[in-house]
């Protein structure tokens, strides 16, 4: 389970944060991700270890994810995991918030080969 936790945290660090709308709600993470992407029990384990409740929503295509995010107000989700080619599209449209790496205490554990890919 710990290996998956590290992978989830790494994915979270590399995923995009949609805004700081939920920033005052430090006990809840609004997470929008691919269907069947997270193993059963992992989010419950995350909550048990951190005390942070995860509100988990899923999508089956980038198009569905994108359309939903375009209709929602900024900050509907804290964490979204689109495919690489959609990240660039969303970046160009101002839909991505920069990640403050200084707040990621385990950032140094991420594989440098996976960072700053075009």
Residue ranges and their predicted role:
Residues 1-2, 32, 102, 116:
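Generic cytosolic/nucleocytoplasmic N-terminal low-complexity/intrinsically disordered segments
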Residues 9-17:
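Bacterial N-terminal signal peptides
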Residues 23-89:
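Early extracytoplasmic/lumenal segment of secretory-pathway proteins
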């Amino acid at each position: 389970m710990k290996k998956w936790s590290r992978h989830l945290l790494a994915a979270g660090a590399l995923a995009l944060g949609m805004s700081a709308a939920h920033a005052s709600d430090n006990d809840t993470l609004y997470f929008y991700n691919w269907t069947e992407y997270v193993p059963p029990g992992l989010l419950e384990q995350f909550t048990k270890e951190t005390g942070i409740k995860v509100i988990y929503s899923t999508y089956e295509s980038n198009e569905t994810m994108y359309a939903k995010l375009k209709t929602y107000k900024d900050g509907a989700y804290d964490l979204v995991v689109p495919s690489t080619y959609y990240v660039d599209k969303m970046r160009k449209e101002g839909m991505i918030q920069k990640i403050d790496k200084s707040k990621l205490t385990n950032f140094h554990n991420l594989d440098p080969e996976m960072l700053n890919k075009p």
